[in-house]
A protein has these predicted regions:
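Extracytoplasmic electrostatic interaction patches
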Residues: 77-167
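N-terminal export/targeting and maturation segments
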Residues: 10-86
């Protein structure tokens, strides 16, 4: 009986210590992710589930582009506004690159709404069809910090190929 109480206490403490407002990548082995990958084709997709115990007025998604480590553009590509309605407690953000057409599809859905947009990538870049490409994203649960911008995925391109150092 004592072991059960201790185990239960540890489980409750761990649950209470987890962030209440968080975003995390959807499990790659989940049914949702496998379905999304089939629909997205060869370039794959990235899915993020968010949860918020607090109310908020808006959710913004920005697209930032960097060239040789310097930011060259920063634009808002999605805004979900909850000014006149109750904000969502949870939702899903999906980013699907289409490297052949040089676009990225962005989908956001929650209990109250759904939204989809497509944004161009590598606009005006010569020989972009020959670039090496890759993608990376957050892997663990991250606390949502209000009034800040937090990176989720990164689409990576390189004219002479793509390489990175594991850290």
């Amino acid at each position: 009986m004592g072991v059960f109480v201790i185990t239960l206490g540890i489980m409750v403490c761990n649950k209470l210590r987890q962030p209440q407002n968080y975003i995390e990548a959807v499990d790659p082995d989940s049914v949702e992710m496998k379905t999304a990958e089939l629909l997205s084709g060869i370039d794959g997709t990235m899915m993020f589930r968010y949860n918020s115990k607090d109310t908020f007025q808006a959710l913004y998604v920005y697209l930032s582009e960097y060239y040789s480590g310097k930011q060259v553009s920063h634009k808002r590509v999605l805004e979900l506004s909850y000014e006149d309605v109750k904000s969502a407690k949870n939702g899903l953000i999906v980013i699907t690159p289409d490297f052949d057409n040089f676009t990225a599809k962005l989908i956001a859905a929650d209990e109250y709404s759904k939204y989809m947009t497509e944004t161009p990538i590598l606009e005006g870049v010569a020989n972009r069809e020959y670039y090496g490409r890759s993608a990376t994203s957050i892997e663990n649960k991250s606390t949502i910090e209000y009034e800040t911008e937090q990176g989720l995925p990164a689409l990576i391109y390189g004219e002479q190929g793509v390489s990175s150092l594991p850290i």
